[in-house]
């Protein structure tokens, strides 16, 4: 669903490092999962958010429970935040600038998630 919307899957630790070690531009990294809140809220929210005028220059995802190596490497970049799936991270010039944890996604509508991300895009992209 995210890949169909133009989001690139990262399947290895090296692919995660290649994208997140870049020191210029913005990167959205989505930790996808099979849970209901990812399917019902997060993925639709991300898809809505990237219809905004401003958006990250790179859209990427790792899949918890499927791409373990890539997810473990991505989570190193999320510190000091604890592991959370699903979650959404926005990086600017190599720095983590915005992060939505599972508890921000659960119970939130796709529209709320999109609005939160779009506000971050306005500030950082």
Where are these regions (language model features)?
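N-terminal leader/targeting and pre-domain segments
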Residues: 1-23, 125
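Local sequence-structure signature of Cys/Sec-based thiol-disulfide redox active-site neighborhoods
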Residues: 18-53
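"Short basic amphipathic alpha-helical interaction patches in structured regions
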Residues: 43-47, 74-78, 101-104
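Short acidic (Asp/Glu) patches
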Residues: 71-85
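Thiol-based oxidoreductase modules, predominantly thioredoxin-like and allied folds used
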Residues: 31, 54-73
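Non-catalytic, surface beta->alpha helical segment in thiol-disulfide oxidoreductase systems
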Residues: 82-125
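Amphipathic alpha-helical interface surfaces
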Residues: 33, 38-46, 58-59, 70, ...
């Amino acid at each position: 669903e995210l890949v169909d919307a133009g989001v690139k899957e990262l399947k290895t630790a090296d692919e995660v490092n290649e994208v997140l070690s870049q020191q210029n531009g913005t990167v959205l990294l989505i930790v996808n999962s099979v849970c209901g809140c990812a399917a019902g809220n997060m993925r639709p929210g991300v898809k809505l958010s990237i219809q905004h005028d401003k958006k990250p220059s790179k859209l990427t995802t790792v899949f918890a429970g499927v791409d373990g190596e890539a997810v473990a490497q991505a989570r190193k970049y999320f510190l000091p935040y604890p592991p959370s799936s699903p979650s959404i991270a926005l990086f600017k010039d190599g720095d983590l600038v915005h992060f939505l944890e599972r508890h921000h996604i659960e119970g939130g509508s796709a529209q709320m998630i999109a609005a939160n991300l779009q506000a971050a895009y306005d500030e950082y992209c």
